[in-house]
Each structure stands twice: as structure tokens, then as C-alpha cells.
């Protein structure tokens, strides 16, 4: 790819990164003369038409968002079978590289970086974009400590289907949320989980879950409790420790519900920072330990705690218990396993049971691991889409689940009926799980967003996304809008959208190229000529040239180009510089003794007695010597100008008329 020019515009210069789905190159935008980053979809994905379509559509959706902490997307396109996204080029390091170089990051920078990342997520989420692959590899840090989150180009617009139905694993197992690992539909809270993992890594220098294979890592996300970060780094304040643990809660409803809540919490952590060393040593009973370990200070109905760490109560215990018997947490005798040993044993049993009993549906379409259908506490989400809100609530509660209305959305479905639900219908979930639904508001009209400033391809993709058609596309010159981007649209932003409606676009041709006649500046001084040309809208390039005519010294003797040319063209002017010793071309007088009066004479540098006789022309210094018939000037000969303006050389050095 190096040296390739995509779409006659983006010249690939060097490879700067490789991801799961694409290769990223540094390139030169030859139109705007700036460096950009070009993400090229890997060849194995280009064969999947559905993937390519969604890749472009989601990148176009992400191009709508412009934020100081998000890498801007400039263009989406294809050149032959090469599909690419053009992004802002950021000079700096990835957060992953900084962590590798420094280990853990100090407290103030953690808060600073986390705040900027949360601002980026908050902005994207408010615009309907879920990243789904937040990890330090996708977070750039400039030399000025400005955070730039990248890779929104392959993110999922939250109201659209996911692009992960391609049986290709997208993302990194170390940062996957439990719901991603299980193939459950995701929302903005999956980004909050991944953000928590990044926060954990910044604070400790390590990820909370690691193993030899992605499968094993995914299992840990689903089943294992993370080691509290302040056990790995004693300098982490309790408030930050709790915040990290809440971000990485297994259940989305137990996490922060949006990035704005995270921003508030970060502000509190920063303003109320107290080093743990300043606290008095205290003795805590088991209940206190349990409450410290659970940021929400409550037991989930499917969790039990051992030394403050949650385990699934449905997994085998060391001793069988009666159905209604309380868990036996009390350690008796010296032959009992220690807390750490028991944790290792339980974890190993979990792995064995899941590996043996599950189908290991290893694809991102169906999830890395499906929930264990053999669990006695699982229930199915009832079919409620299309039901009224009250009927849906009744069915959900009859199934021993909880009902929550998330939003009322514009939909073609009857007003007051369920449009979507999460988890999906027929999904097996734990008893008591919250089923979140969207209810139809009955209003199907949507408003048209602004397409101004978008590349034409991105604008077309958005129009198609809204179920509309592209109407007339005209082009106009613009000094403000880059070539190929939208200048205006009709109907305008805020107009109500009706399915099938036509939207017209005006596309920029870039700045208008205007022509003008180059003014003649022959005979002008350098400053005067430059001023005249610049005022006429031209650039100026000044050169000097030796001349033997003193009258040409310091003035324009040549000018090019001339005539009718593009405004802004650089005009070269040549300024004469008098040099009496400048070499002249050889003459061709053939010894006839006569020269044109306008020609120049090269003075004899060996004698100073050259002079014009009385009554002769005084122009003899501008005339050329005439050589004797044999083409040579005798040594020591003098040159004397004659009255008729002709000069001849004689052997004895006397001039003759």
C-alpha cells in the first residue's frame, strides 16, 4: 500500500497500526495538503458485502460527532476493492504504550485522562453512538496530555444492528464486557465496563482478568471477581477504588448508567481525595468487609460472598446444603481451604463445568459464551413486543422479572405499546433480572439532521439510513467548505422526515479559480513591480540577472508568465544587475569594421586611454570593438571611438574614421 494514492487524493506514506479488522496508515491528503490517518479494511472482510455496508454506514454515522476528545472522521470511501475511512491524524502515543512505559499512572493523571475519556463517551452516547471497543490501544495521548479516543468508525450506532454478525471477533478479550462475551445486546453501559477496565489498568499497570486464551479471559469477565485495585496499588484512594469496581460490575444495572454520572463521580473523587495512609488502622467485622467489597452495599439475588468477594451461589460448594439452609461461610478447623485456595478451586470448577456443559458458541454473532441453560434459577423473558405497557409489565412480573421503561420513542407501532426490550424475548436470564423496554410514543415523524460539512458519501449514507432518497446534487464553489463536502441541503435541518422523501444536496467544488491578466511591470523597480503584482492577486518570485547596460540596472527586464492566467499564480520578474565585465556572446562582423550603434562595447581592461574624439558620438562605451580582418585584436592596441560611431582596431592602437 505504501505509495498508493487512494481516490486520486490520499497518498499512503507509512503503516502506523494494525487492528482486528483494519490496517491504519499515515497518509497525505494531497487536496488539502495535510496529514491524515487512513484506516483500510482488511482483505478478508472486503468479501463480506454486509460487513462492508455496515462498516461504511457506521463510520458515516460516527462522522457526525465532533468533539475535542474524539478523533474526527473526515471521509468514507472506496477505491476498487479497498474500503477505507479517513481520520484526523494525531501525533502522540497510545495510552497502552504509556502504561507499558510507566507501569501504573499517578493519581492526578488518572483523573485527568479518565475525565477526558468520559467526556468523549458522554458526547458519543448522547449522539446515539456506542463505541464497543474501548481499550487503551484506541486512546491517543498527545504531547500536551490531550486525550483523543479513536475507532468510532467501526462502532455501532445504538439504534442499528451490530456489525459483529460476521463470525469475526471484533475487539480485545481483555476489555470485553460480560454482555459482549455472552452475545447479549449492548448499550452505552458496555462502554462504561470497558472504561472501568482501562481505569483499572491505569491505576495498577495490569488488567484485572488475564489468561492464555481469549476464551479463558472471557470466562473470567463473566464469572470471576476482580482483585480490588488498591490491593495491587496501596496508593489508590478508597473512593477511586470503589468507582473502578462499580464500573466493572457484572450486571449493567449495577454500573454507572451513563458517562455523565462518571464525570460527576470523578469530580467527587478528585475534590475529596484523601490518601489511605492518613486513615487510622481499624478492625472490621465480616459484614463491613462485605460492604466495602460491594460498591452498591447490597447482595445480588444470585450472588453470595466469601471474604467479601462474590461467587455464583449455584456453583458446587464444598459441603452439600439443604435447599433452605443458609450458606456456610464460617471456616472450621485447620483442614479447611484458605480463602484463596477455595477461590482457585471454585474458579477451576466453574471453568470445567462451562467448558464441558456449554456449546462454546465462539462467535461474536452469538456471543463467546451463551448463558448456561441448565441453571435452575434461569427464566425466559416473555414475548412482550407489541403488547400494551400494562400487559407487558404483567407478563414480565409473572415471570419473576422486573419491568422498567427506559424511553418513549417515535415509532410506527401503536402508541403505548412495547417497541423493543432488553434482554431480548426468549432470552434465559436470572430470576429478578430487570427487563428494560422502549414504549412507542405513536409519533413517527423524525427531524432531519444537519448534513452540512459532511462528505458527500457520508451525507448519502445518512439520507439512506433515514429511509429517504437523494434528489438533485449540484456543485458550487465555496471558500469555506472543503471540496466534496455538503454546502447546503433541502429540506433544511430540523424539517420533518417522511419515509421516501427526496433530499437535495449542494456539494462544494472548493474555492473558485479566478483568472486575470498579468499586469506588465517592465522597467519598474523590484519593489514597485512586486506591489503591482501582489495587488492584482498574484504571487511574486524575484530573480536577478547580470547586464552590461547600466540603464537596465535595478529594473524589471523580464517577466513571465504573462497574459490571462489563474489568480494566485506566481509571476517571476527578473531584475537587471549592472556588471561591466559580463561576458557577451561573440559577434559575427566578419571583419567589416562596422557595428550597430545599439550594441555594447567591451572596454579594454589593459589600458585606460580609450576615448571618443571631439565631435564623435558619446555612445562609444555601448558599442562593440570591431576586430581586424584576421579576427584578433593585437596585444597592447588602443581603442579610440570615431565620430561616426564605428570603432576599428588597428595594430598600432589608433582609431581611424
From Swiss-Prot:
Domain PASTA: 375-441, 443-509, 512-577
Catalytic residues, chain numbering: 143
CDD domains noted in UniProt: PASTA_pknB (cd06577), STKc_PknB_like (cd14014)
Residues engaged in binding ATP: 16-24, 39
Compositionally biased region (Low complexity): 584-600, 613-637, 645-657
Residue span(s) of domain Protein kinase: 10-274
Catalytic activity field: L-seryl-[protein] + ATP = O-phospho-L-seryl-[protein] + ADP + H(+); L-threonyl-[protein] + ATP = O-phospho-L-threonyl-[protein] + ADP + H(+)
Location of the region described as Disordered in the Swiss-Prot/TrEMBL record: 286-334, 581-657
EC number(s) per entry: 2.7.11.1
Keywords tagged on the record: ATP-binding, Kinase, Nucleotide-binding, Repeat, Serine/threonine-protein kinase, Transferase
Biased composition (Polar residues): 288-298
GO molecular function annotation: ATP binding; protein serine kinase activity; protein serine/threonine kinase activity
Pfam families found in the cross-reference section: PASTA, Pkinase
InterPro entries xref list: Kinase-like_dom_sf (IPR011009), PASTA_dom (IPR005543), Prot_kinase_dom (IPR000719), Protein_kinase_ATP_BS (IPR017441), Ser/Thr_kinase_AS (IPR008271)
Family: Belongs to the protein kinase superfamily. Ser/Thr protein kinase family.
NCBIfam families xref list: PknB_PASTA_kin
Name of the molecule in the record: Probable serine/threonine-protein kinase CA_C1728
Annotated organism of origin: Clostridium acetobutylicum (strain ATCC 824 / DSM 792 / JCM 1419 / IAM 19013 / LMG 5710 / NBRC 13948 / NRRL B-527 / VKM B-1787 / 2291 / W)
Source taxonomy: Bacteria, Bacillati, Bacillota, Clostridia, Eubacteriales
Amino acid at each position: 500500500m505504501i505509495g498508493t494514492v487512494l481516490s486520486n487524493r490520499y497518498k499512503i506514506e507509512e503503516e502506523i497500526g494494525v487492528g482486528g479488522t483494519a490496517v491504519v496508515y499515515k497518509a497525505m491528503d494531497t487536496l488539502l495538503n495535510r496529514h491524515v490517518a487512513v484506516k483500510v479494511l482488511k482483505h478478508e472482510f472486503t468479501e463480506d458485502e454486509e460487513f462492508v455496508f455496515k462498516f461504511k454506514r457506521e463510520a458515516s454515522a460516527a462522522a457526525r460527532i465532533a468533539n475535542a476528545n474524539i478523533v474526527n472522521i473526515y471521509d468514507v470511501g472506496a477505491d476498487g476493492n479497498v474500503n477505507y475511512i479517513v481520520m484526523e491524524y494525531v501525533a502522540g502515543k497510545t495510552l497502552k504504550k504509556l502504561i507499558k512505559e510507566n507501569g501504573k499512572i499517578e493519581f492526578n493523571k488518572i483523573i485527568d485522562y479518565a475525565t477526558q475519556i468520559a467526556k468523549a463517551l458522554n458526547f458519543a452516547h448522547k449522539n446515539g453512538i456506542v463505541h464497543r471497543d474501548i481499550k487503551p490501544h484506541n486512546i491517543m495521548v498527545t504531547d500536551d496530555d490531550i486525550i483523543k479516543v479513536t475507532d468510532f468508525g467501526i462502532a455501532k450506532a445504538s439504534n442499528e444492528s451490530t456489525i459483529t454478525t460476521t463470525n469475526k471477533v471484533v475487539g480485545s478479550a481483555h476489555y470485553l464486557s460480560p454482555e459482549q462475551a455472552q452475545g447479549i445486546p449492548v448499550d452505552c453501559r458496555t462502554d462504561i465496563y470497558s472504561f472501568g477496565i482501562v481505569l483499572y489498568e491505569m491505576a495498577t499497570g495490569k488488567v484485572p482478568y488475564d489468561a492464555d486464551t481469549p476464551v479463558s479471559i472471557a470466562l473470567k469477565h463473566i464469572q470471576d471477581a476482580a482483585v480490588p485495585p488498591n490491593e495491587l496499588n496501596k496508593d489508590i484512594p478508597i473512593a477511586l477504588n470503589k468507582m473502578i469496581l462499580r464500573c466493572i460490575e457484572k450486571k449493567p444495572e449495577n454500573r454507572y448508567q451513563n458517562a455523565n454520572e462518571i464525570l460527576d463521580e470523578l469530580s467527587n473523587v478528585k475534590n475529596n481525595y484523601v490518601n489511605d495512609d492518613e486513615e487510622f488502622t481499624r478492625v472490621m467485622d465480616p459484614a463491613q468487609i462485605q460492604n466495602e467489597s460491594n460498591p452498591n452495599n447490597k447482595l445480588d439475588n444470585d450472588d453470595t460472598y466469601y471474604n467479601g468477594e462474590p461467587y455464583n451461589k449455584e456453583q458446587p460448594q464444598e459441603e452439600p446444603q439443604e435447599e433452605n439452609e443458609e450458606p456456610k461461610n464460617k471456616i472450621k478447623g485447620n483442614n479447611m481451604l484458605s480463602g484463596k485456595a477455595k477461590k482457585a478451586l471454585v474458579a477451576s470448577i466453574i471453568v470445567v463445568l462451562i467448558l464441558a456443559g456449554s456449546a462454546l458458541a465462539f462467535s461474536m454473532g452469538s456471543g463467546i459464551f451463551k448463558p448456561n441453560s441448565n441453571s435452575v434459577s434461569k427464566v425466559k423473558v416473555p414475548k412482550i413486543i407489541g403488547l400494551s405497557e400494562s400487559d407487558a409489565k404483567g407478563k414480565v412480573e409473572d415471570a419473576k422479572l422486573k419491568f422498567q421503561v427506559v424511553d418513549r420513542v417515535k415509532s410506527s407501532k401503536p402508541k403505548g405499546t412495547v417497541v423493543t426490550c432488553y434482554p431480548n424475548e426468549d432470552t434465559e436470564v436470572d430470576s429478578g433480572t430487570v427487563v428494560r423496554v422502549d414504549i412507542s410514543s405513536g409519533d413517527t415523524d423524525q427531524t432531519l439532521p444537519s448534513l452540512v460539512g459532511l462528505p458527500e458519501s457520508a451525507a448519502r449514507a445518512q439520507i439512506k439510513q433515514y429511509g429517504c432518497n437523494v434528489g438533485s446534487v449540484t456543485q458550487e464553489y465555496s471558500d469555506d467548505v472543503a471540496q466534496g463536502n455538503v454546502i447546503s441541503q433541502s429540506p433544511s435541518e430540523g424539517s420533518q422526515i417522511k419515509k421516501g422523501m427526496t433530499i437535495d444536496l449542494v456539494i462544494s467544488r472548493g474555492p473558485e479559480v479566478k483568472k486575470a491578466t498579468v499586469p506588465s511591470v517592465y522597467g519598474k523597480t523590484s519593489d514597485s513591480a512586486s506591489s503591482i503584482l501582489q495587488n492584482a492577486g498574484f504571487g511574486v518570485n524575484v530573480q536577478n540577472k547580470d547586464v552590461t547596460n547600466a540603464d537596465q540596472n535595478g529594473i524589471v527586464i523580464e517577466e513571465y508568465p504573462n497574459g490571462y492566467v489563474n489568480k494566485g499564480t506566481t509571476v517571476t520578474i527578473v531584475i537587471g544587475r549592472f556588471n561591466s565585465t559580463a561576458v557577451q556572446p561573440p559577434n559575427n562582423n566578419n571583419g567589416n569594421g562596422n557595428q550597430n550603434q545599439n550594441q555594447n562595447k567591451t572596454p579594454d581592461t589593459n589600458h585606460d586611454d580609450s576615448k571618443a574624439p571631439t565631435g564623435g558620438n558619446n555612445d562609444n562605451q555601448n558599442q562593440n570593438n570591431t576586430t581586424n580582418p584576421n579576427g584578433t585584436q593585437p596585444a597592447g592596441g588602443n581603442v579610440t571611438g570615431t565620430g561616426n560611431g564605428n570603432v576599428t582596431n588597428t595594430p598600432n592602437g589608433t582609431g581611424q574614421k
